[in-house]
Amino acid sequence: MAKEELLELDGVVDEVLPDSRFRVTLENGAVVAAYASGRMRKHRIRILAGDRVKLELSVYDLTKGCINFRHKDERASPGVPRNRFVRR
């Protein structure tokens, strides 16, 4: 399947399911089952309920999608600084 045949839509994660799967409500109100892309799993990008995401849907099956981007929350404060390992 070529990349040109995929639909890119925005949505909000409603529920986190086992095995890195999610239930996402799209902007048009449709609910789809989605999974995290390999690149997101590789870089350990955490997706939580309430996150805005961008997903790709196949034109052949509009009930399943692949999450390929998690939008950063502008109003979230920067995280607590972690203790870095200091070489002595």
Swiss-Prot record:
CDD domains: S1_IF1 (cd04451). InterPro entries: NA-bd_OB-fold, RNA-binding_domain_S1_IF1, TIF_IF1. Its main location: cytoplasm. Residues 1-72 form the S1-like domain. It comes from the Bacteria. It is found in: Cytoplasm. PROSITE patterns: S1_IF1_TYPE (PS50832). Keywords: Cytoplasm, Initiation factor, Protein biosynthesis, RNA-binding, rRNA-binding. HAMAP family: IF_1. One of the essential components for the initiation of protein synthesis. Stabilizes the binding of IF-2 and IF-3 on the 30S subunit to which N-formylmethionyl-tRNA(fMet) subsequently binds. Helps modulate mRNA selection, yielding the 30S pre-initiation complex (PIC). Upon addition of the 50S ribosomal subunit IF-1, IF-2 and IF-3 are released leaving the mature 70S translation initiation complex. Belongs to the IF-1 family. Component of the 30S ribosomal translation pre-initiation complex which assembles on the 30S ribosome in the order IF-2 and IF-3, IF-1 and N-formylmethionyl-tRNA(fMet); mRNA recruitment can occur at any time during PIC assembly. This is Translation initiation factor IF-1 3. It comes from Burkholderia orbicola (strain AU 1054). The gene is infA3.
